[in-house]
């Protein structure tokens, strides 16, 4: 493996090699670093300082320059963008399947698919960042992406509207990580990192990241000035050990990869909490025929399924003189109130040729974590023949996020 570096940086391959009085000769923003390895994947870095990277981040505290307005192209189909590969792609398709929306691909190599349950909708498989870009350009109307990708490439553009912010997959956070050795051994917070005497205008903190919008924005908001950013694709955890960077800003899920590479997160260093979200083009919802109705159906299915996730229906028979008397017994137990209260129905049986009611059926909805306690309480109240089944959907009278969406659209 050989490392190609500009000559003005070859003198100082690691932070420990910098004399305190020696200024860094920063390369121009276009200077690129490449680690050439036998495998296909490589680490590519482009250095730039805060003032350079922040060309899209206003230095006077105002909003970044707006992206060009989306153009709603005339077409009959609503376009939904899904991630084209990886865990996010599989989880997005699985979630839609759980909502009885089946993505049908004629050929797995094709980038377009159909959802038979939504005949006016096409699915387009794209890279997550391209989903955001194409929502802005008007080539897509809806998309499922991580909030990190939306924030990095959407850059607070008002045409992007979050329809559902918590799809319960793709959980991670964007965080600063530093080495757990050397000069960083006793550094445990963002404040301590910023106050290290090693950083100055001549020798700034070198931060490797793929988030060249969120990174400088976060540092500016926290008043950290002496930072130089290096943009990178992949294998960021190796950058500090290679001497390319002092710290990294990257997505963290379990944190295992950081630990295996002798890196640690710091207090106050989390830039963003992220998970998958359903996003739409505001202009498409306002102007494209059928887009709003399609979003309404997708949103209702999502909300009903996600609300039911981890919930169970519990049914038991209970002897009693009346529904009122049984209800009082059931409601005396703290875990048996259900969503809005227990459903109590008479159980009819025949004795000596006559129909009578000696038992009442109790139906409640309980979360998974309270399931066994609820069963014990039902038994204690006189319940028997307890049946348990998982819930698939809970359709409310109204979908809260739908009302919020209409308000955001001014409808």
From Swiss-Prot:
The modification N-acetylvaline is found at residue 50. One of its GO terms (molecular function) is magnesium ion binding. Gene3D superfamilies: 3.30.70.120, Periplasmic binding protein-like II. Residues 1-49 form a transit peptide. InterPro entries: ATP_PRibTrfase_cat, ATP_PRibTrfase_CS, ATP_PRibTrfase_HisG, HisG_C, N-reg_PII-like_a/b, N-reg_PII/ATP_PRibTrfase_C. CDD domains: PBP2_HisGL3 (cd13593). Feedback inhibited by L-histidine. Transmembrane segments: none annotated. Expressed in leaves and at lower levels in roots (at protein level). Catalyzes the condensation of ATP and 5-phosphoribose 1-diphosphate to form N'-(5'-phosphoribosyl)-ATP (PR-ATP). Belongs to the ATP phosphoribosyltransferase family. Long subfamily. This is ATP phosphoribosyltransferase 1, chloroplastic. The gene is HISN1A.
């Amino acid at each position: 493996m050989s490392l190609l570096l500009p000559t003005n940086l070859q003198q100082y391959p690691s932070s420990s090699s910098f004399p305190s009085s020696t200024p860094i000769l920063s390369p121009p923003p276009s200077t690129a670093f490449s680690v050439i390895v036998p495998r296909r994947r490589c680490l590519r870095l482009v250095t730039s300082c805060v003032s350079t990277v922040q060309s899209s981040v206003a230095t006077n505290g105002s909003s970044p320059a707006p992206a060009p307005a989306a153009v709603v192209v005339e077409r009959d189909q609503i376009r939904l963008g899904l991630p084209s590969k990886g865990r996010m792609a599989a989880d997005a398709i699985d979630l839609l399947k759980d909502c009885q929306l089946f993505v049908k691909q004629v050929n797995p190599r094709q980038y377009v698919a159909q959802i038979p349950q939504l005949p006016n909708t096409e699915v387009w498989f794209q890279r997550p960042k391209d989903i955001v870009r194409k929502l802005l350009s008007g080539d897509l109307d809806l998309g499922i992406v991580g909030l990190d990708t939306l924030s990095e490439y959407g850059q607070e553009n008002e045409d992007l509207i979050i329809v559902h912010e918590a799809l319960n997959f793709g959980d991670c956070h964007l965080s600063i990580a530093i080495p757990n050795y050397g000069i960083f051994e006793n550094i445990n917070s963002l404040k301590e990192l910023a106050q290290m005497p090693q950083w100055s205008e001549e020798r700034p903190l070198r931060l490797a990241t793929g988030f060249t919008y969120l990174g400088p924005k976060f540092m500016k908001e926290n008043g950290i000035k002496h930072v130089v950013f290096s943009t990178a694709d992949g294998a960021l955890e190796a950058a500090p050990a290679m001497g390319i960077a002092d710290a990294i800003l990257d997505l963290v899920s379990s944190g295992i990869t950081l630990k295996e590479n002798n890196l640690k997160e710091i207090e106050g260093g989390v830039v963003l909490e992220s998970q998958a979200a359903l996003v739409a083009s505001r202009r498409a919802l306002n102007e494209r025929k059928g887009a709003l109705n399609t979003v309404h159906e997708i949103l209702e299915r999502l909300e009903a399924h996600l609300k039911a996730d981890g919930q169970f229906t519990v049914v038991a028979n209970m002897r009693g003189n009346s529904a009122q008397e049984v209800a009082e017994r059931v409601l005396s137990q703290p875990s048996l109130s259900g969503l809005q209260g227990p459903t109590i129905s008479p159980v009819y049986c025949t004795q000596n040729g006559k129909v009578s009611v000696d038992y009442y059926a109790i139906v409640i909805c309980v979360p998974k974590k309270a399931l066994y306690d609820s069963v014990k309480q039902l038994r204690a109240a006189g319940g028997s023949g307890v049946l348990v089944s998982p819930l698939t959907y809970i359709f409310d009278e109204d979908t809260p996020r739908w009302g919020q969406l209409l308000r955001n659209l001014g409808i």
